[in-house]
A protein has these predicted regions:
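The catalytic "switch" region of P-loop NTPases
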Residues: 7-14, 42-47, 202, 206-209, ...
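P-loop NTPase nucleotide-binding core
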Residues: 69-70, 75-233
Length: 451
């Protein structure tokens, strides 16, 4: 990703790419942690049993290793979850705290066809790779047991596939019990899961049919790796960060990964953070039965009563100034307008900036009110184009609730509109408002506001 700030109109497009996450060591990174309403970073650390005294981060393995917390961080698209998770990884990955293993499923799995078994195999592969890279040896006994177990699965799978060419784990219980040996096994399974539908289904079925054994091996491997990490002075406990769940193909697939697989999720004993798609926040009570859920909201820039949250505006001004020199804006007030219509979402703000740069007058060489309004009009009507009357009626109710200072109840329509960023959510989810860009659309103006 480009790390150069835009000083000319032509450079803006590359500086505002909104589908590329920014990490804490990147020049564009902005810390929003103190302006996210009721969300507090320290809550995450407490859930993970991390002590944060004297500005450091530590984990007491003797006291907390047996607890193995499963934690879901739920939030809307474009709220900055990936950047936030990367910050946690940076803070916690240290000898006196966690050995953090980040698994971005979008980069490694087939997002059109992914199941929980696929994620688990990916977790094993990533952990083994990171251990190998850190020169951390693991007990040979667990490696031998895994080799033997997967050799049996290979025999079953090849028989079910009638000897189909191309599926070969390379398992040999006589080979040295090295990390690279099982790393190859996990890699080959992952490749097999992304092959034909028949092959993927056969592999998954073989693993699912013996899931208690699989989970037992997984958990033993985690514990042996934890012991090795402590002895090597590389970490006190493994922490998985699983990102990208919201980018899988369908809501049905995402629900299956979390809700339908809850029994298998319970059987895996490792400290883990999952991102939780916004539409599954309605299942919070179910998920809380086997894990902990926290809402990661947009930045609240306007109170329910309509007054600006000045601190949030200042942070977003910093966010913009790191990417675009402020001299490229017609006025400081125009910068505030961009922020206001971003609705507290870093990604939505970048989307508006990109559109405005597209409509900007090259002869002027700046972003002015004219290109800003053209961008808003285009984005507003595109975003609202397929709103049904049922959704418009619900938006009107939410608008009236906010005027009266009331919280709006959740339902499936609200869930759909949160997923599509028609609605935006703040604080702990109790405050919802219409995306300010949508409010400008002809449909909203006519059907909701009656203008």
């Amino acid at each position: 990703m480009q790390s150069s700030k835009a000083f000319t109109l032509d450079e803006i497009d590359q500086a505002v790419k909104f589908n590329e996450p920014v990490y804490p060591d990147h020049p564009f990174y902005t810390d929003f942690s103190h302006v996210r309403g009721d969300f507090r970073e320290k809550v995450v650390y407490r859930i993970l049993n991390v002590k944060t005294s004297d500005g450091g981060f530590s984990f007491d393995a003797d006291l907390n290793s047996g607890e193995k917390k499963l934690f879901f961080l739920g939030g809307m698209k474009g709220s900055g979850k990936t950047s936030e998770l990367t910050k946690y990884a940076r803070n916690l990955h240290r000898p006196e705290c966690y050995f953090v293993v980040t698994c971005n499923i979008e980069e490694a799995l087939d997002m059109n066809d992914v199941e929980y078994m696929d994620v688990l195999i990916f977790q094993l592969e990533r952990l083994t790779y990171e251990l190998d890279q850190a020169y951390v040896p693991v007990d040979k006994g667990i490696i031998k047991r895994m080799q033997a177990w997967f050799q049996q699965r290979e025999t079953e799978i090849r028989a079910a596939l009638k000897g189909e060419l191309g599926f070969e784990l390379g398992v040999n219980v006589e080979s040295p019990p090295l990390l690279k040996t099982i790393l190859n096994i996990f890699g080959q399974i992952k490749v097999g899961l992304q092959g034909s539908k028949e092959r993927a289904t056969t592999i998954r079925s073989s693993l699912k049919n013996r899931f208690p054994d699989f989970a037992n091996l997984f958990n033993q491997y985690i514990e042996e790796a934890n012991l090795s990490l402590r002895q090597a002075g590389k970490g006190q406990e493994i922490l998985y960060i699983i990102d990208g769940l919201e980018k899988t193909m369908s809501a049905e697939m995402r629900r299956k990964l979390v809700i339908d697989e809850s029994n298998r999720l319970r059987q895996i004993k490792a400290y883990t953070i999952f991102t939780l798609p916004i539409e599954l926040m309605k299942e919070r009570q179910k998920i809380n039965q086997f894990s902990t859920v926290e809402s990661f909201p947009y930045v609240k820039i306007i109170e329910r009563q309509g007054n600006d949250v000045e601190m949030a505006f200042l942070v977003f001004e910093e966010f913009i100034s790191k990417r675009i020199d402020l001299s490229l804006f017609e006025s400081k007030e125009l910068v505030r307008k961009f922020i206001r219509f971003g609705g507290g979402s870093p990604r939505e703000l970048l989307r508006i900036l990109e559109a405005a740069a597209f409509f900007a007058d090259e002869s002027k060489g700046i972003l002015d009110e004219t290109c800003f309004q053209e961008a808003l009009k285009r984005l507003a009507n595109q975003t609202a184009q397929y709103l049904t009357q049922e959704k418009l009626d619900r938006l009107k109710e939410i608008h009236e609730d906010n005027l009266a200072g009331r919280s709006s109840p959740f339902d499936d329509l609200v869930g759909e509109m949160l997923e599509d960023i028609i609605l935006m959510e703040y604080n702990d989810g109790s405050y919802k408002r219409v995306n300010p860009v949508v409010e400008l659309s002809d449909l909203y103006q006519q059907r909701v506001l009656g203008k």
